[in-house]
Amino acid sequence: MIKRMYWVAAAAVACVLSADAAFDARPVSIAYRTRKEGSVDVAGIRFNLPRGHNDSVTGLDVGFIGLCTYMYGVQANVLGSLVKDRAGALQVSLYNDVDGLLTGVQVAGWNNARGGEGLQIGLLNLSDEFYGVQVGLINRANLLRGFQIGVINVIRGARVPFVPVVNVGF
């Protein structure tokens, strides 16, 4: 009977360890060195000390520089918040970059999103295709469906590409 209990306990530990490996996600990650793409996903909190790189982060991402392929949640880093593919997030940093599609809000000195919808607030806001509002000193979009509020507002695909103060794209 005792031998059987040891086997059951060993099997339970093996199941927990293999389940952890199968899901490959951590509730808390302290990223103290650069990780390569294809690394552990984080579902919870990631601390970037100084830089973290994970495929997917769901939850809170804080530190100095945060880099991931997919971000869902809040990304608040001192120097940079960088997403390679898709972000459904609030990004707050000196520099925010979403190389794919942003759905959410970017607040920074410099915001960059290849495409997306939501709100960009910063000194410099750049986007290729954006649906929403850009508020900043300089706002530029190739295609914009929404508003730009700032000193220099440029919508490259518009009939009148430059309008100061308020620019509207339809």
Task: Name these PLM-found stretches.
Residues 11-19:
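Hydrophobic h-region of N-terminal signal peptides that target proteins for export
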Residues 1-8:
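Bacterial N-terminal signal peptides that target proteins for export
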Residues 21-170:
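Surface-exposed, glycine- and small/polar-enriched segments that build interaction surfaces at terminal
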